[in-house]
Amino acid sequence: MLNIMKKTTAAIALLCLGSALAWGQAAQPQWKDRAEFDLFELIRKEQNPQAKLQLLQQWEQKYPQTDFKDGRYELMVQTYQQLGKAKEMLDTAKAWVASNPKAITGWYWINLLTVSINDTSPAALDQGEKAAKALLEQIEEALSPAKKPAQVTDEQWNQQKATMEYVAYRTLGWVALERQQYLDADKYFVEALKRNPNDAQVSAWAGRANVRTKQLERQGIALFHFARAAAHSGPGAFPEQARQQLMSSFEKNYINFHGSKDGMDEVLKLAQTAAVPPEGFKIESQDEIMAKQEEELKKSNPVLALWVGIKRELTGPNGASYFENSLKNAHIPGPDGIPVGETTVKKLKGTVVSADPPKRPKKLVLGLSSPNMSEVTLVFENPLAAAPEPGTELEFAGVVTEYSLEPFNVTFEVEPGDVSGLPAPKKAAPAVKKAPAAVKKK
């Protein structure tokens, strides 16, 4: 729980150095008496964190008001950290900012602890949001160029500013995520990743936030963030086992969303080098791909496009409802036809797969999407005079009566006059006329 806080020691030390020098430039702090100084020296030299904590508590009891109150709070937070007591760290940091609202390091600790303690109660989330906003408000003043210590480089100072901003945006994103404010969460997580691209946990949170928007256009962005969380290695990465699990999950979800592995390697390659998706980044969904293909099909083959649309609806999650409400007992494509793009389709077209019975059939099975697929059964009231050969193309219209999903098939009741391409009945051979009998001579 405290791993992320252990990584901030150097950053906090740099901030405190700047703060300490700023105090020195303003007003030199003074000890109340020699006893206070001696107590501080004991605290400074004590290596045992439990003993140090007891000395700090003595200092607090004996000298509640001191010029070194900020330093004392800081030492108490660090000592509780050594003891692994996160709640006490948070309580101390809260008391610190209550005593000094401009104690930027106190606000910083509250940000870190809000997320790591994982208290999602409304009060804790409110506290985290307040701490993050307070931190952002104070950064410009606390880390202005004028306050940079001489021994600190411009690069170090700017990095410290970016680190503080990253922590604040990370907290705001986490709070928004827990409040189910998913668009806000994504916005804050992106700002955090711009300042610290190595935080795989933030990438995973950003993926979760985008998924939970339930907006189609954000699902591809979610996949990018999950790819980043799985692909990132080095500082800030997940452990290897967790990365493997994330990668398996990413691959499965990518295929489910996109319909195939096409483009997946390119997404992973991009995610290895970038923490946030570039402007205009998009992964097309299966539905978007199919819709695009259908639009093209409407122009090139409107009859097939009509059938593909019907079949997609019937095989979808609401197929039974679609059949009952839109197809059952309906004449398809109808006496006036169905508009498809700029064309009105008045008959569907298929290829004969089989006839039942083979001679004088009452049923013909057709493939519409492909000549070999048994997708439609045409049912005639009376046997046909002749059976069409397999491979024969027919155009038809009729009344839909039933359908099955496994195997997929739609049944149409048709009249011979509504079917084009049926073979003409074979004409009977003309009767052979017998030659007239010869007249017998008398």
Predicted features along the sequence, with ranges:
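Short solvent-exposed coil/turn linkers within tandem alpha-helical repeat scaffolds
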Residues: K62-G71, A98-I104, E141-T163, A192-D199, ...
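Residue at a conserved register position within TPR or TPR-like alpha-solenoid repeats
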Residues: E46, Y80, T114-S116, A176, ...
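TPR/TPR-like (Sel1-like) alpha-helical repeat modules
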Residues: V115, D126-E140, V211-A237, Q272
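N-terminal leader/linker segments that initiate helical-solenoid repeat arrays
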Residues: A22-L75
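Structural motif corresponding to the intra-repeat A-B loop/turn of tetratricopeptide repeats
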Residues: E46, L83, I117-P122, R179, ...
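OB-fold and OB-like single-stranded nucleic-acid-recognition modules
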Residues: M264-K442
